[in-house]
Amino acid sequence: MSFNVSATADASNTAGMAKQYAYEMDKAMKEWSNDAEFALMRSTVISTSGSALRSMTSLKASITTNATSQSGVSLSENTLNDYLGTAWDQGGNPDEVYVGKTLKRRISGFTAGNTKFVDSTDKRLVNAVDVYESDFGIIKLFKHRYITQSGDNNLDIVGIQSDKFRVATLRSPQHVSLAKTGDATKGMIVGELTLEFLAENSSFKGTAHL
């Protein structure tokens, strides 16, 4: 994630910021984090070659054992419990479910126990998070913008046993100065991470829902 700022822009008195370069660096760091989140959820593994950078296997791509294509079937409460049961039969115990906005609203309409709470030890839970009481235990429901995106032809759902997945960081994101050319200062944000999945059959994935 690279950026550059002209000397004129950096020297100017810009409202709302002390220095243009610092602002662009902060913005690039946020974009890097956003790209990393996208890759963790949706990327497909690619080996390094002359024309392609290496990439990791994402959360969606890593779940293969308990992966079901529903071919246009609407997500129901029974279907969700079937997903959880399939993972349970494989020795898993999913405790988190990730969906886009449409399936999140559908699950919120289920008749089973559905409440809200805040767990102060879980730093992801800034606001109250929905909790679904399933036949296989209590599940945290997370609305995630990259599960389903504009342009996708289906709606997907992913449920994981959270202690079987983790982000492994090789290099934390950091600012690196680039060689100056002309009347501009250049920099980039660089970092390396990957997704570790210890037992993907502990989790489930349902695709192609209406």
Predicted regions and their residues:
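Flexible, glycine/threonine- and acidic-rich loop/arm segments that mediate assembly and lattice contacts
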Residues: 1-210
